[in-house]
């Protein structure tokens, strides 16, 4: 059996014939990012934050005042990335749930309630980050907002030491 030695460093030089490459030529690969229009950030909304603290004491969802933002997608294939931070002041055994609402419909709700159970600590200020990737399939203006509900009807404070906020981005889809 004959053995061949291949010079790997100089194995391929020159130009590959066009018929051997499915994409016209290797030079066309640089055009690939332009050919794939998904994933680009097309627009970013204003950063909107709560202007004052708010207390929630019901297990039913209620709006987080002023934490609402509008965006008008440029294409029906666009996705909307929702970014939100919720600042809370929880006492031991208290907690909350949150949901994102588009128009009047819930599009995402936490599966579990964020609760504080800590031995020896009576009060904690914290910030939780919530993100969601939405597909409104529309070029009409979309309104997104945050709603909060209490755990076990406890009276919880939101946006006391940290102003809760929301921001959205249109992503090419």
Predicted regions and their residues:
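Terminal beta-strand-rich extracellular "head" domains
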Residues: 47-48, 54-57, 61, 72-141, ...
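Extended, low-complexity regulatory regions
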Residues: 67-71
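Short, solvent-exposed loop/turn segments enriched in Ser/Thr/Gly
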Residues: 63-65
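Glycine-rich, low-complexity segments
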Residues: 1-53, 173
